Amino acid sequence: MLLTTTDVLQGREVERYLGIVTAEVVYGTNVLRDFLASLRNIIGGRTRTYEEVLENAQKKVLEELEQRAKRLGANGILGVSIHTNMSATMILVTAAGTAVKLR
C-alpha cells in the first residue's frame, strides 16, 4: 500500500478512484502522565511522554486508514492528511485520504 500526502504519485497511474477513507484514534489522558508532563513543562524541555503517545497514535491511525482502504480494494491512498486535537480528557488523531487503485 502506497500512502502519500500528494495528489499524484510520480510514475504511477490511477486506474480507479475508490472514495474517501477516514480513520480515528482516541486516547484518554492519564492523570500521572499529565502530572509528570506538567512538571517537565515547568522546568523546561520536551515532554517525551506525550510525544510517545502522539507518535503511537499517528502510527495507529495510518494503519487503520490503510486497512479501510484495503477493504475497498485500494493499493494506494492519495492526499493523506493527519490532524491532532487535544482536550483535558483525550487526545484525538484523525487521518483522511482518497483510496485509489494504481496500475
Curated annotation (Swiss-Prot):
SUPFAM superfamilies: YbjQ-like
A Pfam family matched in the record: YbjQ_1
InterPro entries assigned to the protein according to its UniProt record, in alphabetical order: UPF0145_dom_sf, UPF0145_YbjQ-like
Assigned protein family: Belongs to the UPF0145 family.
HAMAP family: UPF0145
Family matches, as PANTHER family: UPF0145 PROTEIN YBJQ
Full protein name: UPF0145 protein CYA_2258
Native species: Synechococcus sp. (strain JA-3-3Ab) (Cyanobacteria bacterium Yellowstone A-Prime)
Lineage: Bacteria, Bacillati, Cyanobacteriota, Cyanophyceae, Synechococcales
